[in-house]
Amino acid sequence: EQEEDSLSGKTLEISTIADYENVASGVASSWKKIGVASKLKVTMSLPDTFQILIYPIKLPIDPDQYVLWHSSQLSNISKYKNLRIDKLLEDGRTELDQEIRKKIYLDFQRFLVEDVPAVFLYHPTFYTISRK
């Protein structure tokens, strides 16, 4: 109940780019149904500041997400800072043993999800069909 009161009378701004305007509208519509007011802000590029951002992030095949989450990186768009996450990302980049590296990145993923620096809406799947 206290969380609901903290949003009472406030309008949240959802920033996005044109390609994701429909996704942002869907989020705004869902929030409206539960009484959360929001407005869309469609920009041409990644904004410097935002309340809520719906933006595509391409994750690498390798689990190293140093450029996305390490506090020293300009590409850390959420400005997230967590010393434990920083250390795991640093260790993962330098570890050569694949089993140890796997454990490091599993810990990174677990702590990142527990800390909630971002809400991951979905991971789209794209298919390409071609003739040989």
Model-derived regions: residue spans:
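Structural transition elements
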Residues: 1-4, 16, 21
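N-terminal hydrophobic or amphipathic helices and topogenic motifs
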Residues: 1-8, 131-132
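Short, well-ordered beta-strand elements
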Residues: 9-17, 38-39
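Detector for C-terminal structural segments
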Residues: 18-29, 48-132
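Short glycine-rich hinge loops at helix-strand junctions in the catalytic core
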Residues: 35
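Short acidic low-complexity segments
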Residues: 39-48
